[in-house]
Amino acid sequence: GPEGSIELTLLDGHKAVFTPEQPLQLPQWFHRRDEELEAQAQALKARAGESGYVEKSNKDETFRYHIARVNDEDDGIHEEPMLTNEDLVLGIRPEFLSITGGGNVECEIYGAMPTGMESTVKVRIGEYLLTGVVFGSTLFTIGSKHLLDITGSSVMLFDRSSGRRITSGTLKLL
């Protein structure tokens, strides 16, 4: 595929390929990220040594996302695992979830709320719950099985450890 396509394993073992909209070389991206983070740390250290420096009370924090699971005990933030450059996050808009045919991953309707010309659906894949928006007046039956596909060309790829957006592209579930 195009330069920089990334093979991913997601949702408890499902395979997918992310294809960036621009050529991408992840090792160079991670190298630049590390250099920028080091430069920021050095600049902060220099500022902290200046007289009159006041530490920000609203420190910048890495965004922590939460993917719903069927048996979530609580909404608390759990202990973060040790992250590597292999830990990536996908940002997928709800309308990019397609369950009207042509997909490769089986999902089950866990919840559905028709709202006029569209329906908000919760689909279950293994123990994960994803929220989608389906256009049209289709009525979905709780528990019915469908094939999930990801459409749309602006699926976002993030670096999990820094929270920074790497690029946008397409995601093909295999």
Regions found by a protein language model. Give the residues of each.
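Non-catalytic connector elements of ABC transporters
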Residues: 1-174
